[in-house]
Amino acid sequence: MARRRQLYEGKAKILFEGPEPGTLVQYFKDDATAGNGAKKGIITGKGVLNNRISEHLMLRLHDIGIPTHFIRRLNMREQLIREVEIIPLEVVVRNVAAGSLAKRLGIPEGTRLPRTIIEYYYKNDSLNDPMVSEEHITAFGWACTHDLDDMVALTMRTNDFLSGLFVGIGITLVDFKLEFGRLWEGEDMRIVLADEISPDNCRLWDAKTSEKLDKDRFRRDMGRVEEAYQEVAWRLGILPEATNSDMKGPEVMQ
């Protein structure tokens, strides 16, 4: 296995130096967290499934012209991505009331919202990722108005496409979180979709039964977490057959 220099480790992924300038290797872990890291656990095989699911969805988005950092999947747990300057915001898209929105506004969970709602959260673990407004974002220089316009346009297109895709396999896209980055190509910069799209950062409910098929099963101690992730992959037609060697992490060069 190739020896790579580790650059960053987050809750669910590790970033390594890529084989070429301007590239990184993104490794998907089985670690699971909730409550901004207050609850921790392991979901066996989660990294393998999320790698495949995110690859599939990123490629489908690329097909309709949405720029992403994804280049290609390397193996069961790793993918090659473009190195981008991450914008320190989480863009949350809500189609159905659930989670913090339902609690904060007293809306019964499962209520279809009058229209899609976009929220912004400042990425800062020590502050518990506070919700912020466009005024905060531009005032503190996290993103300019033009960047935000691009992010919103890409977010709405992504939501429209993914909502339809999931409807086609009997799943409701309740809400999800996106992250964006600035991709520099010489003097030119464009906003691209980054991070991942998986049951880790999407709320996915069975369209008929409203059974949760996402990380809420871990957050709420509902059990059958692995099975839920497998169900999503199976419906997408990409359920992988992992071997023991696929479950090992990469060899790290200190």
From Swiss-Prot:
UniProt pathway annotation: Purine metabolism; IMP biosynthesis via de novo pathway; 5-amino-1-(5-phospho-D-ribosyl)imidazole-4-carboxamide from 5-amino-1-(5-phospho-D-ribosyl)imidazole-4-carboxylate: step 1/2
Entry's Gene Ontology molecular function annotations: ATP binding; phosphoribosylaminoimidazolesuccinocarboxamide synthase activity
A biological-process GO annotation: cobalamin biosynthetic process
Its EC number(s): 6.3.2.6
Key words, A-Z: ATP-binding, Ligase, Nucleotide-binding, Purine biosynthesis
An example Gene Ontology CC term for this record: cytosol
Catalysed reactions listed for this entry: 5-amino-1-(5-phospho-D-ribosyl)imidazole-4-carboxylate + L-aspartate + ATP = (2S)-2-[5-amino-1-(5-phospho-beta-D-ribosyl)imidazole-4-carboxamido]succinate + ADP + phosphate + 2 H(+)
Pfam families documented for this protein: SAICAR_synt
Source superkingdom: Bacteria
Keyword NADP: no
InterPro entries: SAICAR_synt/ADE2_N, SAICAR_synt_PurC, SAICAR_synth, SAICAR_synthetase, SAICAR_synthetase_CS
Family listed: Belongs to the SAICAR synthetase family.
Protein name (record): Phosphoribosylaminoimidazole-succinocarboxamide synthase
Gene name as annotated: purC
